[in-house]
């Protein structure tokens, strides 16, 4: 049984690191899409004339 003073399993550390990176990328994507600078984003499909 692990106690709080023992070292965590390396697999748990890797899983938590990957989870943190994915959450950070998701948060950054949402902030880019809906944040304060989203009003300056343009849609290339709307800008294209046929």
Swiss-Prot record:
Signal peptide: none annotated. Keywords: Membrane, Thylakoid, Transmembrane, Transmembrane helix. Pfam families: PsbN. InterPro entries: PSII_PsbN (IPR003398). Belongs to the PsbN family. Its main location: membrane. This is Protein PsbN. The gene is psbN. GO terms for biological process: photosynthesis. It is found in: Cellular thylakoid membrane. The keyword Thylakoid applies. GO terms for cellular component: plasma membrane-derived thylakoid membrane. May play a role in photosystem I and II biogenesis. The chain crosses the membrane at residues 14-34. It is a single-pass membrane protein. It comes from Prochlorococcus marinus (strain MIT 9312).
């Amino acid at each position: 049984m692990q106690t709080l003073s023992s070292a965590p399993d390396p697999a748990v550390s890797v899983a938590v690191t990957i989870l943190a990176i994915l959450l950070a990328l998701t948060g950054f994507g949402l902030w880019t899409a809906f944040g304060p600078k989203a009003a300056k984003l343009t849609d290339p499909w709307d800008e294209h004339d046929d």
